[in-house]
Regions:
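Periplasmic/cell-envelope proteins involved in peptidoglycan metabolism and beta-lactam response
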Residues: 1-238, 249, 254, 325-337, ...
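Beta-lactam-recognizing serine transpeptidase/beta-lactamase-like catalytic domain environment
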Residues: 57-59, 214, 218-259, 264-495, ...
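Amphipathic alpha-helical surface "interface" segments used
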Residues: 101-106, 138-141, 351-356, 450-457, ...
Length: 602
């Protein structure tokens, strides 16, 4: 009898345990997994946005939905698949097969539009869950993509460009907003960037070039206004393009600068008074350096140094460069920072500049025509700027400042410079010669009648390891300053291995430089006033009922709302107090006199 009771007790206990397990399983499937979705996203930080100098969003984070499936809770996989298919852009057969194949919870499709996620939830399908995720979006596609970079599907996992370099700042919450990272503001001007990419990309396609690179930099601050690299890619679909497209060739491409190097040799000659102003050098059309015969495009006859630059005379610059002692030339080239990284971005190439102990009697002669030395595009632009800005070697920079979600500046980047002792006389001589290059020399295809450009063409054969210089492989470039009388901008256009009959810097790169300058003159000339100008390419948001330059009514708005409304206009804002806006200067509908808007909150 006792044994019978014991067996009943054991059986009853077993049934109770089994019942509790079943109840627990139901509770888990019904509630716990849903809670897991919330916990998974509850502590996520929204990645900060990346803006150009106008406030145009180059990278932003938006809410998205990810659809998850609990196969054990789905009683009719076919019905569920048919219901989901139209929203997920997937064949129902494929969805059904995946559901039947899986046994544990899985993600069916990630980062779909949030509105689609809401519609799927309205279907009330058993076993279908929605997870909230953040999605990184690049609203203007490939605009500045090689510079900005991209993130993976998880937006906290940066993969390239500025997204990687400033990943920590973009993902670290600020004191004013614990849910969002800092915003990154660039020196890039989206309108100038667009014009550069449009002109450069068109010629890149037409010539079938291996690469095309364009840079525009403020000559007095080192701020990069535009930087383009082709082949390009859309960071929204980065998996559809190769690594060559993802690379920022403005800092990675290493090449021999060719005749653009002549301005640096001429700068040394002028700066050290190593030749007389009226001194001339004879060019019979070639010069022999040992067993090597270097040709000129023509037998130029007798030329002074300015004319040597004007006609890009190889023989003339080689003969003139022999006046420079090797140690002095070496010191100047190091001041120009050849063979060194500029400090612009971390993965920058250094180029190559031979140590003095490896120099031969011919080293300086080949260097005069841009051979035996290699540079990056950003390096050449920075070095050239120092010739035209009075000897200030600037560190190029593309980041202006960080801000919080209310627009308050958290950290501002300053101009870094090193004086290298270029005299005003030297600058005047070089700019005068380079202006003549464009007016009547090898760079005449960059000439604009109403606007002066100073420039230097570069055409060089490419060398391949073990084979030397190869016929048919060329590098074509144009280095320019504008306006020539008092330069504000230095720029470089470069084509690597162009195909077809035109491969010279004057024939290929100079016309592109001209097109870019013509298109951006209104932007450069009007300065800050153009921050209210936008292209159709950028018209994502509009201020309804607000004329360009007029201030909208912001009374009653929060700081975030005011910032969002004013962002497309690029108007600088100064916040006073906290809470909601009760006063603004200037008043709604009026224009700012000093370009700044003061908002008062309480």
């Amino acid at each position: 009898m006792k044994s019978h009771k014991t067996r009943l007790t054991i059986l009853f206990s077993f049934l109770c345990i089994l019942f509790c397990i079943l109840i627990g399983r139901v509770v888990f499937l019904t509630f716990w997994n849903e809670r897991e979705v919330v916990l998974k996203t509850g502590d996520r930080i929204m990645r900060g946005a990346i803006y150009d100098r106008r406030g145009i969003e180059l990278a932003m984070t938006v809410d998205s939905a990810t659809i998850g499936i609990y196969p054990a809770n789905i009683y009719d996989p076919n019905f569920t698949a048919v219901q989901l298919a139209p929203y997920l852009d997937m064949p129902p057969e494929k969805i059904e097969a995946i559901i039947r194949e899986k046994s544990r919870y899985f993600l069916l499709k990630r980062e779909i539009d949030e509105s689609l996620g809401n519609k799927i939830m309205e279907l009330s399908l058993p076993g279908v869950r929605r997870e909230k995720e953040y999605k990184r979006v690049y609203p203007h596609g490939n605009l500045a993509s090689s510079l900005v970079g991209f993130t993976g599907m998880d937006d906290d996992r940066a993969l390239s460009g500025l997204e990687v370099q400033y990943n920590q700042e973009l993902m670290t919450p600020t004191e004013s907003d614990s849910s969002r990272g800092s915003n990154l503001h660039l020196t890039i001007d989206g309108l100038i960037q667009y014009k550069l990419e449009k002109a450069l990309g068109k010629r890149f396609e037409e010539t079938g070039s291996k690469k095309a690179i364009g840079i525009l930099m403020d000559i007095n601050t080192g701020k990069i206004l535009a930087s383009a690299s082709f082949p390009a890619f859309d960071p929204n679909q980065y998996n559809e393009s190769g690594e060559d497209s993802h690379t920022n060739w403005a800092i990675r491409h290493v090449y021999e600068p060719g005749s653009t190097m002549k301005i640096f040799l001429a700068s040394v000659l002028f700066n050290e008074n190593l030749i007389r102003p009226d001194e001339k050098f004879h060019c019979p059309g070639y010069v022999e350096l040992g067993k090597t015969k270097i040709k000129c495009t023509n037998a130029h006859g007798h030329l002074n140094l300015e004319e040597i630059l004007q006609y890009s005379c190889n023989v003339g610059i080689i003969k003139a460069s022999q006046r420079i002692p090797e140690a002095l030339l070496y010191d100047y080239m190091k001041k120009f920072q050849f063979g060194e990284k500029t400090g612009f971005l971390p993965n920058e190439s250094a180029g190559y500049f031979p140590p003095l102990k490896k120099w031969t009697p011919a080293t300086s002669m080949f260097m005069a025509i841009g051979q035996g030395i290699s540079v990056t595009p950003i390096q050449l632009v920075a070095s050239a700027a120092s010739v035209a800005n009075g000897g200030r070697m600037l560190t190029p920079r593309v980041v202006s400042h960080f801000s919080d979600s209310y627009g308050a500046i958290l950290h501002e980047f300053k101009t870094q410079e090193t004086p290298i002792g270029i005299r005003e006389y030297t600058t005047e001589k070089i700019l005068k010669a380079m202006t003549r290059v464009v007016q009547s020399g090898t760079g005449k295809n960059a000439y604009i009648q109403e606007y002066s450009i100073a420039g230097k063409t570069g055409t060089g054969q490419k060398a391949i390891s073990g084979k030397g210089y190869v016929e048919g492989l060329w590098s074509a470039s144009f280095l320019g300053f504008f306006p020539a009388e008092r330069p504000k901008i230095v720029g470089l256009i470069l084509f690597d291995e162009p195909k077809g009959g035109t491969h010279s810097g004057g024939g290929l790169a100079a016309p592109v430089f001209k097109e870019v300058v013509e298109n951006i003159i209104p932007i450069i000339e009007q300065g800050e006033r153009t921050l209210n100008v936008s292209l159709k390419h950028f018209q994502r948001k509009n201020l309804k009922g607000t004329n360009v330059g007029e201030i909208p009514n912001l009374i009653g708005k929060s700081k975030r709302e005011a910032l969002e409304i004013l962002r497309p206009s690029g108007i600088p804002i100064k916040f006073h107090g906290s809470g909601f806006c009760y006063k603004q200067e200037p008043d709604p509908g009026k224009k700012t006199e000093d370009g700044r808007l003061n908002l008062y909150f309480k």
